[in-house]
Regions:
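Hydrophobic alpha-helical transmembrane segments of multi-pass membrane transport/permease proteins
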Residues: 38-64, 71-87, 188-193, 246-247
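Membrane-interfacial helix-loop-helix junctions in multi-pass membrane proteins
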Residues: 146, 194-250, 262
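Transmembrane helix segments
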Residues: 58, 62-64, 174-215, 219
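Hydrophobic alpha-helical transmembrane segments of multi-pass membrane transport proteins
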Residues: 50-53, 57, 70-142
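Alpha-helical transmembrane segments and their short interhelical loops
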Residues: 113-114, 118-185, 233-245, 250-252
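Aromatic- and glycine-rich beta-strand/loop motifs that create alpha-glucan
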Residues: 2-50
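Junction motif at the cytosolic side of a transmembrane helix
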Residues: 2-12, 58-61, 141, 229-232, ...
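Hydrophobic/aromatic residues in alpha-helical transmembrane segments
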Residues: 53-58, 83-90, 134, 166-167, ...
Length: 263
């Protein structure tokens, strides 16, 4: 959908009425999906490389793992695949919109800012599905394990995906320079891969670093996902949900603060 038809469609109905909000949301969703379709294969490939790829590589480093260790690797793979989607690709897409001028165009539309944010977060959640499914399929096939999938898998994946995308969107709005955002996200991925207890127990970290991860979201992403895929490997899942909820809210507040300043 091009810029002119999008603006015309949004102008056709007041966004103050519930039906207008829904129509504007659907139009924005269609616009986002069509404009980002060239990124979809890249996003899925990146998820698989960092999710299943890292789980498989870790297995080469430690070839004789007990069953619990293998389950840690496999159940941590989805978190590794969701982090780059929300915290790298989302800021990169926003930076691309700034460069192309699409970002300012979207801000100028007569539609509530919350609708634009909701559309972006919805697209990210939809993109995450094939990457996470492929990551889990490859990891379980490689190690030959059977997961104990519970109904909690739905809220776990929804919250982790929403949190990662919300934080990434907040970062992209707070930092206006796309080059700085790119630098920050690359450093973030480096730190996550090397210094986050996602694919192994946090108890293997020094006490001070383990304490740091109590407040960061990465460890808690792995906890809620692992709890929904296995039994007996995680404890205190409620705290992890609270931490992820707090980071999600922080991302929304960051976006809202930037919106209020811009007007």
């Amino acid at each position: 959908m091009s810029a002119q038809p999008l603006a015309a469609t949004l102008l056709g109905r007041s966004p103050r009425r519930p039906a207008g909000w829904l129509r504007a949301y659907l139009v924005m969703l269609r616009f986002d999906l069509s404009s980002q379709r060239t990124w979809l294969p890249f996003a899925v490939a990146m998820q698989i490389l960092l999710g299943a790829g890292m789980a498989i590589i870790y297995g080469f480093y430690v070839p004789h793992l007990p069953r619990a260790g293998i389950l840690y690797l496999v159940s941590g793979a989805p978190a590794l695949s969701l982090i780059p989607l929300g915290m790298v690709i989302v800021p990169a897409l926003t930076g691309q919109q700034r460069t192309a001028g699409t970002f300012d165009f979207l801000w100028s539309l007569p539609v509530a800012r919350g609708i634009q944010v909701a559309s972006t977060l919805t697209v990210c959640s939809l993109i995450a599905v094939p990457g996470v499914v492929a990551t889990l399929a490859l990891a379980t096939w490689r190690y030959g394990v059977t997961l104990s999938i519970s109904p909690a898998v739905i809220p776990a994946f929804l919250l982790t995906s929403l949190m990662a995308s919300s934080v990434g969107l907040g970062l992209a709005h707070l930092v206006r320079n796309p080059m700085v955002v790119n630098l920050v996200t690359n450093i973030l991925i480096f730190l996550v891969l090397l210094y986050s207890p996602i694919s192994f127990p946090r108890s293997q970290f020094p006490t001070w670093l383990a304490d740091v991860h109590e407040g960061l979201p990465f460890y808690h992403m792995a906890v809620v996902i692992r709890a929904s895929l296995t039994t007996g490997l995680t404890t205190d899942v409620g705290t992890s949900y609270l931490v992820l909820g707090a980071w999600t809210l922080a991302g929304w507040l960051a976006v809202g603060w930037v919106m209020s300043r811009r007007g």
